[in-house]
């Protein structure tokens, strides 16, 4: 099995081209290879699969074997890999994700053959707390929150995977 290791703004992934070399999506295997002590080590495995009415499909299996709908850092790695390896032969294309169809735009470095810029239209953020999911009615925006005796305000948002955000003034 051939794989690639990609890094995207602090996340690292094992990338599998399942178009050229089909392998089954196997969450238990992903958990093993993502282990940083006994495996390759990664935040997750990115499967690049044939498109479903799109140019390609991406599935993400996290290091704990759960499946994510989307990951911004992961989809940029997938888009770069797809163009750099010839799976996709255009600068703008579509990727099916667990969150739906997302549009990718890439730009190659004029001095070499590799992609130097990747832009993904992530769509609108999900702000409804129950859809994030958070046990709260409505939008969880600038809500008071306490953890370990520290009080702060936080926001719950999803772009296909849940985020809990707090702005901190330093």
Predicted segments — roles?
Residues 97-167:
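ATP-dependent small-molecule kinase catalytic core of the GHMP/sugar-kinase superfamily
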Residues 1-114, 165-167:
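A glycine-rich beta-to-alpha transition motif near the start of alpha/beta enzyme domains, typified by
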């Amino acid at each position: 099995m051939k794989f690639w290791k990609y890094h995207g703004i602090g996340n690292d992934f094992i990338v599998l081209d399942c178009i050229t070399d089909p392998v089954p999506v196997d969450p238990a295997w992903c958990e093993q290879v993502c282990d940083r002590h006994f495996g390759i080590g990664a935040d997750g495995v990115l499967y690049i699969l044939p498109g479903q009415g799109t140019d390609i499909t991406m599935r993400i299996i996290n290091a704990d074997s759960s499946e994510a709908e989307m990951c911004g850092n992961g989809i940029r790695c997938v888009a770069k890999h797809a163009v750099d390896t010839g799976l996709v032969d255009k600068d703008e294309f579509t990727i099916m994700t667990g969150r739906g169809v997302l549009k990718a735009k890439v730009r190659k470095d004029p001095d070499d053959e590799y992609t130097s810029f990747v832009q993904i239209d992530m769509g609108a953020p999900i702000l409804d707390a129950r859809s994030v999911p958070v046990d709260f009615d409505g939008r969880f925006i600038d809500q008071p929150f306490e953890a370990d005796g520290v009080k702060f305000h936080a926001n719950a948002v999803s772009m296909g995977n849940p985020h809990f955000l707090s702005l901190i003034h330093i």
